[in-house]
Amino acid sequence: MKEKDNFEMVINLRKIKTGKRTGRSKRAVKFVRKIVARHFNADKVVIDPLLAKSISKNGNDKVVSKVRVVVSKVGEKIYLVRLAIKSR
């Protein structure tokens, strides 16, 4: 199987929006970390601060419903998750 060194994916955060309002952004960041760890069999997942800020850009209780991320391999079972920025 081909190694996933640089991978782009869309993570759906609608399940987070159905929960209670307080602490939604924190739960959303934990959910992103859990999804990436599950898909890539990672021991450590590093979240870019720009991604965390874009998830909660409308406040801590109003998270976005979907987020497009780029997952890059940094080391042995260590992955960096960044916000995917479209280039025109």
UniProtKB/Swiss-Prot annotation:
Q: Which GO terms describe its cellular component?
A: ribonucleoprotein complex; ribosome
Give the highest taxon in the source lineage.
Archaea
Give the Pfam families listed for this entry: Ribosomal_L31e
Matching entries from SUPFAM superfamilies are given as: Ribosomal protein L31e (SSF54575)
GO MF assignments: structural constituent of ribosome
Looking up InterPro entries in the UniProt record yields: Ribosomal_eL31, Ribosomal_eL31_dom_sf
> Keyword Nuclease on this protein?
no
Q: Name one GO biological process term.
A: translation
Alphabetically sorted, this entry's keywords are: Ribonucleoprotein, Ribosomal protein
What family name appears in the similarity comment? Answer: Belongs to the eukaryotic ribosomal protein eL31 family.
The identity of this protein, by name, is Large ribosomal subunit protein eL31
